Amino acid sequence: MAPPPLHLFSPHVPSTSVSPPDPATEAPPAPKQHRGPRPAPRNPGSAKPLTAGVPGGRTRRAVLGIIRKVRSLELSDPRTPSPNGGGGSSSSSTATARVPFHLPIHPPPPEREEEEEKKGIRRAVPWAAARDEETKVVLRREKKTRVPTRAETELEAGELERLRRAARGKERWARAKKAGITDEVVEEVRGQWAKGQELAGVRIVEPLRRCMDRAREILEIKTGGLVVWTRGGIHFVYRGSSYLENAKRHRDFVNYNEELSPVTSNNPTSQGKYWSKDETLTNDNDEADDKDDKPIKGTLYEREVNRLLDSLGPRFIDWWWNTPLPVDADLLPEVVPDFKTPFRQCPPGVRPALADEELTYLRKHARPLPTHFVLGRNTKLQGLAAAILKLWEKSLIAKVAVKVGIQNTNHEQMARNLKRLTGGTVILRNKDYIIIYRGKDFLPGGVAESVIERESQVHDQQAKEEEARLKMADSLQMIVGLSSERSYVGTFREYQDFHDSHARRTTENNFRIQLEAKKHRLEKELKDQEWRLSMLTKKIERSNQVLAKLHSSWSPSKKDGDRELLTEEERRIFRKIGLKMDEHVLLGRRGVFEGVIEEIHQHWKHKEVVKVITKQNQASQITYTSMMLEVETGGTLIAIERFTTSHAIILYRGKNYRRPTKSAPSNLLTKREALQRSIEVQRRGSMKYFAQERKKSIDELKRELRNVTWEIRKLNHDTEQSWTA
């Protein structure tokens, strides 16, 4: 059985009869303009025409490009059908097919085709990739259908375009707060409308700017207007054509709500001030009468989440993410009567602590969950704790978001108080979210009450059995005349005594183990600190040896007894000259060495006064440096002046000054030795400081070790006395 004919160039397609062209009727072809290298001459017996001039050579991409070009040629010049009508004689089926390629393509023998069909082998052909590429279906990502806004549905196109043109020229707008669209922002918007302006702009800031659609809904709910245009982070709100009638109706509605009794408005919410409860939760802005005629919106999961959050408390309308809106924890009661931390009991054989894998799983599980509560206060969270306990009966995790823009919020204190009130486990806490896991030992309210009730019943039954046993023992003693001494073997009292003593011993043993572990840790740390102190001491001794070697390599000059005397007026003049000088000698970390003395003599070559700048802070160091410079240079110290970040030492060369034959003295350190001395002095000072800190920590560890040893001895003494008693 022959394979089906291929559309491109199949050897099984009957060859078409090609008549030679008539040179008289056919126009000469136009000369082709070659761009780039000319292709090699065609040779039917070689494969060079396939790849000549094609980038990529024989790669799959190049072959596919050749096949596309051949197909375009076939479509532009269709073949004439053969006179045999495709019936196909034996000569046409065995002959070489005429194809656009200059390669002889021969059909496979029929025996080979039958064997391949029996074995189910599909032969790969060069044009199969191109054929599959045409039939390949590419599924593009579908764009999210854009939901029209209220302004686009309620306003006419011409009116909407007019309002948007007016909004483009508006230069002033109100600024929302971090807390969202607050009452101040709403009043500012209505104030602009009251002045006769149709549009009022509101700039949205973080975090509400993350979801501008939600910001638009909040603006329309709270102000009663329509957002007609959005530019960047600014919403432009249209007051509406019937603004005066709506404002009058709003005032009447507010007055009516103020006349209501406090019993009917038991739980005031922020959304009740602007919109009804159903309209707020579903973000539906139509009339309430038409609500029953509309189909139910949202999936089953969304409706269940909304139903659960409705049962926990009032919703937070200024939520900066999409629905469902979380519960506003600040509107929950601060104190709940008879509230206490719930009873917990872990199942047998289960450890209450979370493993690392379990913690990672819970954090991943909490990521896609909706936010349940929004909190803005640090204390008085009993109402929130009661709502979390109710939520835990249907969910493993409670997700609490921290309000943005509220002053003095401390998420660490919030998490600590919630953990103390609920007994849960905080698995994540940051400046945005607090996620609390209910724990493995959590029991729902009904189950906890059943466990407590069952335990009380068992205790009462045991007490009744004990009372009956005692009565029976008394009656037997009266009849038989047994001894009046009562035995507690096998009784409930023996169980209670054993349980109390075992619990006490267990507590004492645990406390003793903790003290022993603390003592072992302190001893180990003390030994480590002493070893570190010994190493520091050895390094300090080694540094002292290096410094002693450096100090032995230089010697100070002798002080000249015959010194020039200067009057106060001369000192004042030289001081003024020295302070006005811009040129100076900078004394760095190396201190006084031969290079400094040489530079001072270079200054004195042209000037009588030299100014030396030093960065030293201690007065003793500055005095020692000035005296050393005076002795080594042979000059006269005029003054020591204090600047903002440094000190200036002014030296006068003297009236009988003579330049020395050797400007660099040989009794001082060289530049390299001075740097080595500076580094070693700094290193020794740091080591002395750390050695002092080590000594303080060692003294503190010894004091703690004495206290722990004394507590262990006292505990052992008390245990011995209890055993003897």
UniProtKB/Swiss-Prot annotation:
* Compositional bias per record (Pro residues), positions renumbered to this chain: 20-31
Question: Which InterPro entries does the UniProt record give?
Answer: CRS1/CFM2/CFM3, RNA-binding_CRM, YhbY-like_sf
Segments for region (Disordered): 1-121, 259-295
Any one GO MF annotation of this record? mRNA binding
Alphabetical list of Pfam families matching this protein: CRS1_YhbY (PF01985)
Q: Name one GO biological process term.
A: regulation of translation
Q: Where is the composition biased (Polar residues)?
A: 262-273
**What does it do?**
Required for the splicing of group IIA introns in chloroplasts, by regulating the intron folding. Forms splicing particles with RNA. Also involved in chloroplast protein translation.
Q: What is this protein called?
A: Chloroplastic group IIA intron splicing facilitator CRS1, chloroplastic
Which organism is the protein's source?
Oryza sativa subsp. japonica (Rice)
